[in-house]
Amino acid sequence: MAYPLQLGFQDATSPIMEELLHFHDHTLMIVFLISSLVLYIISLMLTTKLTHTSTMDAQEVETIWTILPAIILILIALPSLRILYMMDEINNPSLTIKTMGHQWYWSYEYTDYEDLTFDSYMIPTSDLKPGELRLLEVDNRVVLPMEMTIRMLISSEDVLHSWAVPSLGLKTDAIPGRLNQTTLISTRPGLYYGQCSEICGSNHSFMPIVLELVPLKHFEKWSTSML
């Protein structure tokens, strides 16, 4: 979840988000080491009186600064590609949800059910109840079963949108005339908030997303009540 004055990421709620956090820490450490080395060399240049203006070539140094960056790039690229392919994998989803972006709300269709569709609008600030979050609450939450593979099909009816839920590591563009897909798995129940992450007009800031992840038996009761 998110906290007031938070500087880091939200708590990971899916295996993909956990992998992304590990990759972030891995890459950040590499960047920190490189930056420290560069600052150390600059400080030496500014403080020492030794110069090498007569040096015409240094094969050993040139070899090192050619090979070392290549190794560093490989250390960054390999885990990045691994996560990229993991995010594209969709193996036997238990449930498929079709999401359509509109100006300025979302509509959802549970394609495994005969007639389970609804629109999801932001609740105005004047209608919020105590404890509800401003600009993040909706009238119809997307209820999903936890610990199950869920496929999201995402498109748009009008302009470009982007369906994003940070704590699940999800961000997929909603493009008119094109159907994108992503997968999500939640490791624990709860409410997870997101927003449209592509500027789509004057009310772009008023397109929140709320996922309610519940145990399977509660999801079955909810789906039965909606039909």
UniProtKB/Swiss-Prot annotation:
Stretches of the chain found on the membrane's Mitochondrial matrix side: 46-59
Cofactor(s) required for function per UniProt: Cu cation
Residues that bind Cu cation A1: 161, 196, 200, 207
Single annotated GO MF: cytochrome-c oxidase activity
Annotated positions binding Cu cation A2: 196, 198, 200, 204
Topological domain spans for side Mitochondrial intermembrane: 1-14, 88-227
A Pfam match: COX2
Residues that bind Mg(2+): 198
Coiled-coil ranges (or none): none
Main localization of the protein described in the UniProt heading: mitochondrion
TM segment ranges: 15-45, 60-87
CDD domains: CcO_II_C
Compartments, as annotated in UniProt: Mitochondrion inner membrane
GO process annotations (BP): ATP synthesis coupled electron transport
Cofactor detail note: Binds a dinuclear copper A center per subunit.
Family membership: Belongs to the cytochrome c oxidase subunit 2 family.
Record's function text: Component of the cytochrome c oxidase, the last enzyme in the mitochondrial electron transport chain which drives oxidative phosphorylation. The respiratory chain contains 3 multisubunit complexes succinate dehydrogenase (complex II, CII), ubiquinol-cytochrome c oxidoreductase (cytochrome b-c1 complex, complex III, CIII) and cytochrome c oxidase (complex IV, CIV), that cooperate to transfer electrons derived from NADH and succinate to molecular oxygen, creating an electrochemical gradient over the inner membrane that drives transmembrane transport and the ATP synthase.
The protein's name: Cytochrome c oxidase subunit 2
Organism listed in the record: Rhinoceros unicornis
Gene giving rise to this polypeptide: MT-CO2
